């Protein structure tokens, strides 16, 4: 995941934006940090989904076919 310092900076810039004191340089920095955060989030979420197996109450594997295919293509 993204470093805590970067997440803190995203939050700090967000507060400045709400207050109306965000400079154009900070706006560029905010956009860059947000894109980096979203990329990191998506990568981790994809990994979580690929490693999840869904079992129904009868014990049958009901993991969606698309997830199984992602898993196969990964290895």
UniProtKB/Swiss-Prot annotation:
| Gene3D superfamilies per record | Helix hairpin bin
Asked whether the UniProt record includes Cytoplasm among its keywords, one would answer yes
Any one Gene Ontology cellular component term annotated for this protein: cytoplasm
Stretches of Basic residues bias are at 65-75
* Origin: domain of life: Bacteria
Extract the ranges annotated as region (Disordered): 56-75
Subcellular location per UniProt equals: Cytoplasm
Give a yes or no for keyword Cytoplasm in this entry: yes
Q: Coiled-coil segments, which residues?
A: none
Please provide the record's keywords in A-Z order. Cytoplasm
Entries under InterPro entries matching the protein: DUF896
Report the family membership: Belongs to the UPF0291 family.
Q: What is this protein called?
A: UPF0291 protein lmo1304
What organism is recorded for this protein?
Listeria monocytogenes serovar 1/2a (strain ATCC BAA-679 / EGD-e)
């Amino acid at each position: 995941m993204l470093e805590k310092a970067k997440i803190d900076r995203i939050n700090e810039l967000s507060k400045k934006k709400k207050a109306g004191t965000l400079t154009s340089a900070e706006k560029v920095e905010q956009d860059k940090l947000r894109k980096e955060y979203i990329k990191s989030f998506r990568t981790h979420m994809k990994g979580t989904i690929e490693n999840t197996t869904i079992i129904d109450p009868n014990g049958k594997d009901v993991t969606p076919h698309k997830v199984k295919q992602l898993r196969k293509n990964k290895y």
